[in-house]
Amino acid sequence: MTPVPGEVDLLVVGAGPTGLFAAYYAGFRGMSVAVVDALPEPGGQVTAMYPEKMIYDVAGFPEVRGRDLVDALVRQAAQYDPVYLLGRHAEKLSEVEGGLLVDVGERESVRAGAVLVTAGIGEFTPRPLPAADDWLGRGVVHFIPELGAHSGQDVVVVGGGDSAFDWALALHPVARSVTLVHRRARFRAHAGLVDKVRGLGVPLITDAEVAEIRGDDAGPHEVELALAGDRRQVLPAQAVVAALGFTADLGPIESWGLELEKRTIRVDSTMRTSRERVYAAGDVAAYPGKVKLIATGFGEAATAVNNIAVALNPEAHLFPGHSSNMG
């Protein structure tokens, strides 16, 4: 486990794309940085939930694979040597003279001039597929870390939201067959995404639930669906993707005395929270007109870091100049 630094200028809570860019930008502004995250590797939801999916709304990239975006952000930040405290929680927050003290588990703490919360949706737990409990981890998954593992397989995707359709779209080129099953007649996914998957000829079975998964020690062989009117349908399946969404909460951050709004943190135009020296950016930050995008998070990270630079050193300039003039 990485040694915990005794003191840094900025502690970033959350190692998703926004947190990684904040780590880079804080280094660019001359700050020492530590990044704490409960997950075992950087990337946040992108790494944990959709490393193989293509992302289409990051500036400068017509498309970019999730894991490739994370790798690029880690490389960008590496030039300033941020300290990664992975597999740890940011627990108790307390004020000390000239800064903040954050407990990071294992009876260890980090003293920081400021804290930037980039925790995304917080700690997330996938919603279970009841009929799949006995198969979880051996044929039934919530997220796909490697698409190639499903090459030549019959895959059943369960869900009706964007995530389910994203997985169907990603699996289509590699799997032998992909079938999407949803328990309702209407989908929550974006209409354009539904049309794209339907246009590929992927069967979309609605008003259906997974009744049973059958197989052997090698894994699933087939999925039995319960349809309307007490009908049944059996699909071949060597893999099932349960894309049913997830539950999330902010964990210990909820006890930090910040002004919260539906599991997000209220911020002002400088990205400062209701507590001095504590800032927030990315999906976890809330303000009027907020749009939750990775691209938005990058801008919020820069806004937060520049204002933190001035908060820590009143003689610093809010605007650091254009990076293109500093080569």
Swiss-Prot record:
Binds 1 FAD per subunit. Its EC number is 1.18.1.2. Its cofactor is FAD. Gene3D superfamilies: FAD/NAD(P)-binding domain. It is an enzyme of class 1 (oxidoreductase). Keywords: FAD, Flavoprotein, NADP, Oxidoreductase. FAD binds at residues 18, 37, 45, 50, 90, 124, 283, 324. It holds the Pfam family Pyr_redox_2. It catalyses: 2 reduced [2Fe-2S]-[ferredoxin] + NADP(+) + H(+) = 2 oxidized [2Fe-2S]-[ferredoxin] + NADPH. GO terms for molecular function: ferredoxin-NADP+ reductase activity; flavin adenine dinucleotide binding; NADP binding. Belongs to the ferredoxin--NADP reductase type 2 family. Homodimer. This is Ferredoxin--NADP reductase. It comes from Saccharopolyspora erythraea (strain ATCC 11635 / DSM 40517 / JCM 4748 / NBRC 13426 / NCIMB 8594 / NRRL 2338). The lineage of its organism: Bacteria, Bacillati, Actinomycetota, Actinomycetes, Pseudonocardiales.
